[in-house]
């Protein structure tokens, strides 16, 4: 049975991609990061998400693969992406199809706000 976890920016499937189709698998997890291209990514930031995913999957080693566990991994990755955004490692893609600022309004520095509103 195909299990999946879908959040705004993370999709995880118990499947592998063959001929551009998802094929159910008991041994492979497929990760789709930011499918709507809401953010601008550099390779280093994207690799951080993949490494975090690997760490989270490893932390569930020996446990049953359930939809609940996949959702926990997906939620943890959402929080990780939010932290990358807050640290300025990624930014919103202003050319995205939809601008919904799902992780908060972008911060724009101006002379009046410079140095204020830091997390």
Swiss-Prot record:
Catalytic reaction(s) noted: a plastoquinone + NADH + (n+1) H(+)(in) = a plastoquinol + NAD(+) + n H(+)(out); a plastoquinone + NADPH + (n+1) H(+)(in) = a plastoquinol + NADP(+) + n H(+)(out)
Keyword check for Nucleotide-binding: no
Record-linked Pfam families: NdhM (PF10664)
Its EC number(s): 7.1.1.-
GO molecular function: oxidoreductase activity, acting on NAD(P)H, quinone or similar compound as acceptor; quinone binding
Entry's Gene Ontology cellular component terms: plasma membrane-derived thylakoid membrane
Domain of life assignment: Bacteria
Topological category with respect to the lipid bilayer: Peripheral membrane protein
Keyword annotations of the record: Membrane, NAD, NADP, Plastoquinone, Quinone, Thylakoid, Translocase, Transport
Localization per record: Cellular thylakoid membrane
Protein family per UniProt: Belongs to the complex I NdhM subunit family.
Function recorded in the entry: NDH-1 shuttles electrons from an unknown electron donor, via FMN and iron-sulfur (Fe-S) centers, to quinones in the respiratory and/or the photosynthetic chain. The immediate electron acceptor for the enzyme in this species is believed to be plastoquinone. Couples the redox reaction to proton translocation, and thus conserves the redox energy in a proton gradient. Cyanobacterial NDH-1 also plays a role in inorganic carbon-concentration.
Known partners and oligomeric status: NDH-1 can be composed of about 15 different subunits; different subcomplexes with different compositions have been identified which probably have different functions.
Protein name: NAD(P)H-quinone oxidoreductase subunit M
Organism of provenance: Gloeothece citriformis (strain PCC 7424) (Cyanothece sp. (strain PCC 7424))
